From Swiss-Prot:
<comment type="function">
    <text>The heterodimer glycoprotein H-glycoprotein L is required for the fusion of viral and plasma membranes leading to virus entry into the host cell. Following initial binding to host receptor, membrane fusion is mediated by the fusion machinery composed of gB and the heterodimer gH/gL. May also be involved in the fusion between the virion envelope and the outer nuclear membrane during virion morphogenesis. Interaction with host integrins ITGAV/ITGB3 triggers release of cytosolic Ca(2+) and FAK phosphorylation leading to efficient viral entry into host genital tract epithelial cells.</text>
</comment>
<keyword id="KW-0732">Signal</keyword>
<feature type="region of interest" description="Disordered">
    <location>
        <begin position="171"/>
        <end position="207"/>
    </location>
</feature>
<feature type="glycosylation site" description="N-linked (GlcNAc...) asparagine; by host">
    <location>
        <position position="332"/>
    </location>
</feature>
<feature type="region of interest" description="Interaction with gL">
    <location>
        <begin position="259"/>
        <end position="323"/>
    </location>
</feature>
<keyword id="KW-1043">Host membrane</keyword>
<feature type="transmembrane region" description="Helical">
    <location>
        <begin position="804"/>
        <end position="824"/>
    </location>
</feature>
<feature type="glycosylation site" description="N-linked (GlcNAc...) asparagine; by host">
    <location>
        <position position="437"/>
    </location>
</feature>
<keyword id="KW-0812">Transmembrane</keyword>
<keyword id="KW-1160">Virus entry into host cell</keyword>
<keyword id="KW-0946">Virion</keyword>
<feature type="glycosylation site" description="N-linked (GlcNAc...) asparagine; by host">
    <location>
        <position position="784"/>
    </location>
</feature>
<dbReference type="InterPro" id="IPR038172">
    <property type="entry name" value="Herpes_glycoH_C_sf"/>
</dbReference>
<dbReference type="GO" id="GO:0020002">
    <property type="term" value="C:host cell plasma membrane"/>
</dbReference>
<keyword id="KW-0472">Membrane</keyword>
<keyword id="KW-0945">Host-virus interaction</keyword>
<feature type="glycosylation site" description="N-linked (GlcNAc...) asparagine; by host">
    <location>
        <position position="120"/>
    </location>
</feature>
Amino acid sequence: MGPGLWVVMGVLVGVAGGHDTYWTEQIDPWFLHGLGLARTYWRDTNTGRLWLPNTPDASDPQRGRLAPPGELNLTTASVPMLRWYAERFCFVLVTTAEFPRDPGQLLYIPKTYLLGRPRNASLPELPEAGPTSRPPAEVTQLKGLSHNPGASALLRSRAWVTFAAAPDREGLTFPRGDDGATERHPDGRRNAPPPGPPAGTPRHPTTNLSIAHLHNASVTWLAARGLLRTPGRYVYLSPSASTWPVGVWTTGGLAFGCDAALVRARYGKGFMGLVISMRDSPPAEIIVVPADKTLARVGNPTDENAPAVLPGPPAGPRYRVFVLGAPTPADNGSALDALRRVAGYPEESTNYAQYMSRAYAEFLGEDPGSGTDARPSLFWRLAGLLASSGFAFVNAAHAHDAIRLSDLLGFLAHSRVLAGLAARGAAGCAADSVFLNVSVLDPAARLRLEARLGHLVAAILEREQSLVAHALGYQLAFVLDSPAAYGAVAPSAARLIDALYAEFLGGRALTAPMVRRALFYATAVLRAPFLAGAPSAEQRERARRGLLITTALCTSDVAAATHADLRAALARTDHQKNLFWLPDHFSPCAASLRFDLAEGGFILDALAMATRSDIPADVMAQQTRGVASVLTRWAHYNALIRAFVPEATHQCSGPSHNAEPRILVPITHNASYVVTHTPLPRGIGYKLTGVDVRRPLFITYLTATCEGHAREIEPKRLVRTENRRDLGLVGAVFLRYTPAGEVMSVLLVDTDATQQQLAQGPVAGTPNVFSSDVPSVALLLFPNGTVIHLLAFDTLPIATIAPGFLAASALGVVMITAALAGILRVVRTCVPFLWRRE
């Protein structure tokens, strides 16, 4: 090409396989000669309009073949968007020395024209590239046409056109975290390295997994090669357009989000790109590269200096972290602090479990906030911990070339739990909009794994009856997250919840970690159908009963004990040897329809049960309120209520009400009781007597109708007999409340044994969940909408008859019978005689 022409060719690189070649950075000295000309490349300095190239007319018989393809729809409006790439074409920009007065020509050449063409004999022969001993770079920034005087104005970053992704460079250049890696501790000061496979340990193919492998998942190792994604070439594009594309060897990614937030993490060899965006806060981006790499910021085309490096903390022994975001100390100090902490996470551990344990603790340790509102700082921290967990999991699996089965199932299960908690509890998302996509497994291998696990789900529930086996089956269904898996385990999960309720009524405390874990996954299985759309009638009925049982399991004593258990568990957790797994501390309150656990009465009850501690009282009270708020946010599913308790959200014409439900009791398949602090305009309403006037309580029986009227609660003394006959209470709900307006228990009378337990009252030495030493009022809520104030059960004695009296009575009956027989005989004899005489 002659000296009078300048040619700029851009080749966009996508995902490709193979490890034989990679990107290498080459500097054209011509670029440097023209740096001073960049400031002159504005076509119209008055309006700041970007320079636009000319394109051939597709109808031109000579040059139409070089016109932009029709699918790009390039116009003067779309050309500045830089969407020039078409998969079937290469584009070439030809300009002259008169640039920018001559805007140049943007030409498109089909790739098919370039394939298989013979070499031009007039061109000098290129030397063959010999083999190189240098391994391919893990991370290479593709600066492309940076500071090219012929293209920098055209390819000017949108970050300099519309916004700057790092407005406060000094604010985003902060010191390294306290737990970050050092030369002495290159994997983090508090790192607990994940175990590797012992020498000689076999690697099991996923197609051969059995129930025995599931029971011994902690010593069952799978081959990473073939199960994980094979590293492939990939170009990471920063959404902020503040840095140039980065070439990496991708190993997968993790994404989760909802209607109010989105998190995307891209993993690679020595690389992680994390983007966090929310509806209620500006976006943030974290980029992790090897310690010896730098990422240049896309500079102003008129700047003659070399581009600046992206902000972030100083490099560590293994990685360097760059930060892009808008928060500044002046306007959002908490968000900036959260971003600083997120930037330190990738260097603090190589063990995925440590990150997940810390994420659970972050969720429970956050200040209560206000209801279900979004809290960006908490969401950023949870997203950073979850993304760093995936980064550590993938890196450890590739380093060991093996994956422990328990780690694989644990990572997938806890990722789903944490994504849901972060989305609903921190981002304010609608529950039915939450999604999670973990793409670190090879797609074909994942299908084989899911098929095998789906087979084992049905087998383990069919062949084994232990609680451990059933909890494992429910966890597998939760990991698979498919309608088929949920349908296979849902009947078993419903029976398990009923069985645990029977044990609870018998006085057993459901506090063992295995019981809590089984209850966690069982309730998750029953709630799952509402995420897939409208549940069937069977699914709705099963879920309604499950919600009713978990609400019954959540008494005031259970709620207070849950606070104490969570505080104690968090206090002894160091996230190294002692990890915190939330399913092992699960409370039925978190899956119930009780939304009153953050009220003052429950907080005082929880503090009363607190053991002696050096923690200041105000700090303990704040922690308790935080845990109570978490339980409420965890359980508060507006979408779930609409799906399974639609009568509670039924819309009627006329004035609406803002009464927030405190407790929901789905007592039949189409009717529910709701407890509120203000009366509702529809349904059968009852005002509870003897309650503090500052916190009144109302109970309303709701159906799908819009009529409403009030009734009085009638006090009654019920009668029980000593022959244990049916009392007509099966299906009713026993509700106990205090004068302070605290509902202590909402217990379902589900069987004859339960109604007999209620009627008989407390027995010495045997716990009875229906009784209470606290001054309170007991109500019975019946399925037909009737509510009575239960005063007591009166015993109706059975009359005692002496044996002698029975013998005399029998003799009297015999004598009377004989007399009647004699009289009848006389009548039969006399009547014919008198008839003949007449």
